Regions:
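Short, surface-exposed connector motifs at secondary-structure boundaries
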Residues: 23-25, 53-58
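Alpha-helical structural signal in soluble globular domains
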Residues: 46-49, 71, 75-79
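Active-site beta-loop-alpha junctions of metal-dependent nucleic acid enzymes
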Residues: 9, 28-52
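Mobile genetic element proteins and their domesticated derivatives, centered on retroelements
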Residues: 16, 22, 43, 59-62, ...
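RNase H-like two-metal-ion nuclease catalytic core shared by retroviral integrases
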Residues: 61-63, 69-72, 83-107, 119-122, ...
């Protein structure tokens, strides 16, 4: 989520972003500080986009209260989405989203004059124009100066090398920090609970 404040307007925008294609999959706007619905609606958009997909898709977020909520995580059940969360207070675990929010904001202010908006519908229109520009017209260095949408199309046509990053991975419901603690306790022949009490 990133916030925009100008004139008397305040908006929070949540972007869902594909790290592989660099495409903005969806974005949702809230006109109230702390509105949780934008996160839920955005995730529902992503679920709709993933209908018919069979390969796992990693959804990485920070540990914000919305992302950790039962309501948010219920939407992921029975989907191909695998959850990943940054460590608490570690924005460096999510550098892609942290940096993209910064330079997208800069482009919106400088190139799209978003600060001239005086109503929510104007803001939504400028944001939609930017997302279209970003996905369909803006060359991306990381994609060999291709656009995100064209890169995705080329990938699905088989023009780009396909890598299965999940091939040798075993997914577990148990968080890694719990696995490490359990392994440490077993290696010392002490139960996890006894170890924590010391």
């Amino acid at each position: 989520m990133t916030a925009f404040k100008f004139w008397i307007l305040y908006f929070e925008v949540t972007f869902y972003f594909d790290v592989f294609t660099k495409e903005i999959l969806t974005c949702r706007i809230a006109a109230r500080k702390g509105d949780r619905q934008q996160y839920i609606d955005g995730l529902e958009d992503v679920r709709e986009l993933l209908k018919g997909h069979t390969e796992p898709v990693v959804l990485h977020t920070d540990q914000g209260s919305v992302y950790a909520s039962v309501a948010y995580n219920e939407l992921i059940k029975d989907t191909v989405i695998v959850r990943s969360m940054s460590r608490a207070g570690k924005p460096t675990d999510n550098p892609v989203n942290e940096s993209i929010n910064g330079w997208m904001k800069e482009e919106l202010y400088i190139d799209f004059n978003i600060s001239e908006c005086r109503r929510k519908d104007e803001f939504e229109e400028v944001l939609a124009s930017y997302v279209d520009f970003y996905n369909n017209h803006r060359p991306c260095y990381a994609l060999g100066y291709d656009t995100p949408v064209n890169y995705r199309k080329r990938y699905y046509k088989g023009e780009l090398e396909r890598k299965n990053t999940f091939e040798n991975r075993v997914l577990s419901e148990e968080p890694k920090f719990v696995q490490k603690r359990r392994k440490r306790a077993y290696s010392k022949d002490v139960s996890t609970f006894e170890k924590e009490d010391e």
